Amino acid sequence: MRLCDTDIEKHLDEGIITISPRPDNGKINGATIDLRLGNSFRVFREHSAPYIDVSGPKEAVAEQLERVMSDEIIVADNEAFFLHPGVLALATTLESVKLPADIIGWLDGRSSLARLGLMVHVTAHRIDPGWEGKIVLEFYNSGKLPLALRPNMIIGALSFEVLSGPAARPYNSRQDAKYKNQQSAVASRINQDR
């Protein structure tokens, strides 16, 4: 069952779901809460590798990932990050989110931004039960013009669904959780898959 606006408020008020900084209640819609864009970005360095062998030896994959991903780019609140057509970039939400073991989150992009060609997540829109940290966004500009994205703009909407019971293996308790407590645009850690 998805939480409605009054249940989202109640879960925030009671500390069952934590979002920091907490958006004001005006950012809570019928079944979602708006999240804003943070300051942390990463991009792919062009022509730094002919390909990424995502199923190759872990050490080789780690080396390729290090070569192709930029260092963290911090964009000031009053500046813009330009996402050009056909480019994939990573960014974070401004807010940090903490979910209990019996609630899963779903991040959706905004229709108004999608109509300009912006995809907020390429495939990863599930926020696991037990998650804690900022949400990394996988931006892709499928439009024809560069898009200027500014920190603090509303970038997506998060909804919450109550599970049939608490997860036995919530994200924050797993030893293999690769993105636990992430606070920046963390690059892929596919080389850490088991």
Swiss-Prot record:
Pathway annotation from the record: Pyrimidine metabolism; dUMP biosynthesis; dUMP from dCTP (dUTP route): step 1/2
Binding sites annotated in the UniProt record for dCTP: R110, S111, S112, L113, A114, R115, D128, V136, L137, E138, Y171, K178, Q182
Gene Ontology annotations of biological process type: dUMP biosynthetic process; dUTP biosynthetic process; nucleobase-containing small molecule interconversion
Keywords, ordered alphabetically: Hydrolase, Nucleotide metabolism, Nucleotide-binding
Signal peptide: none
GO terms, molecular function: dCTP deaminase activity; nucleotide binding
Known EC number: 3.5.4.13
Active site positions: E138
First-tier enzyme category under EC: hydrolase
Gene3D superfamilies referenced in this protein's UniProt entry, alphabetically: 2.70.40.10
Catalytically driven reaction(s): dCTP + H2O + H(+) = dUTP + NH4(+)
Any single Pfam family the record assigns to this protein: DCD
Source organism superkingdom: Bacteria
SUPFAM superfamilies listed in its UniProt record: dUTPase-like (SSF51283)
Stretches for region Disordered: 173-194
Ranges of biased composition (kind: Polar residues): 180-194
Record bears the keyword Phosphoprotein: no
Family affiliation: Belongs to the dCTP deaminase family.
HAMAP family tied to this protein: dCTP_deaminase
Quaternary structure, from the entry: Homotrimer.
Record function comment: Catalyzes the deamination of dCTP to dUTP.
The protein's name in its UniProt record: dCTP deaminase
Record organism: Actinobacillus succinogenes (strain ATCC 55618 / DSM 22257 / CCUG 43843 / 130Z)
Lineage of origin: Bacteria, Pseudomonadati, Pseudomonadota, Gammaproteobacteria, Pasteurellales
Gene designation per UniProt: dcd
